[in-house]
Amino acid sequence: PLCQGLFAQAMGSSGSVMGFKKVATLKEAEEEGVQLAQKIAEKIGKKNGKKVGKKVGMKNLNELRALPAEELMKLAEVRAVPVYNIDGYFMKEQPVEVFAKGEQTKVPLLIGGNNQEMTPLAVLMGKQPTVENLKAGAKATFGEENIDELFRLYGINSDKDVLEQPGVNLASDIFLDYSTWKWGNMHKLTGGQPVY
């Protein structure tokens, strides 16, 4: 890694890049960026290159380009999370593969998390907070065949449970807790250093 030898210990909290899904390739991240740009353009009034920025008071494309990114995202009412990716420079391969081979920086590691790491709204992806909608969102991670047992284990039995602690626990485990555990476990197995 580029940072080899630059630090003596590491601390990680609230997730890692070793969750249920693989890290995006550069091509996939660029495609996602194009989709985001299209959503932004649609929200602020661009249609086939015309009416650019009209809905937000911009006179031309240059004025729109001059907006700070945060303001543009706010005006466009689009929420997005930056996507780390395998760019061939900083990240050359899947982190899980690096750790499986024991090629990570070998330093003591402290990992952790917080209560209520993630809201169920992240799993719902804009849909109403119902058991059925939460199940639909969770199926992408756990599959159709496991969903009823999963909801039984988490105690998600009614729509009320979706936004309360059972739903928070599920969302936190999907997005952060599992990936943090996996990072620590893989480092313990191949890093030759203690994990706390």
Residue map of PLM features:
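Primarily recognizes the serine-hydrolase "nucleophile elbow" in alpha/beta-hydrolase
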Residues: 1-21
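Helix-loop "lid/cap" segments that line or gate small-molecule binding pockets
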Residues: 30-42, 53
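Flexible glycine/proline-rich, aromatic-decorated loop/lid segments
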Residues: 5-7, 26, 74
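The feature captures the conserved acid-bearing segment of alpha/beta-hydrolase catalytic domains
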Residues: 19, 23-31, 96-105
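Conserved structured core elements
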Residues: 1-4, 27, 177
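Short acidic (Asp/Glu) and glycine-rich catalytic loops that position anionic groups and cofactors
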Residues: 9-16, 33-36, 159-163
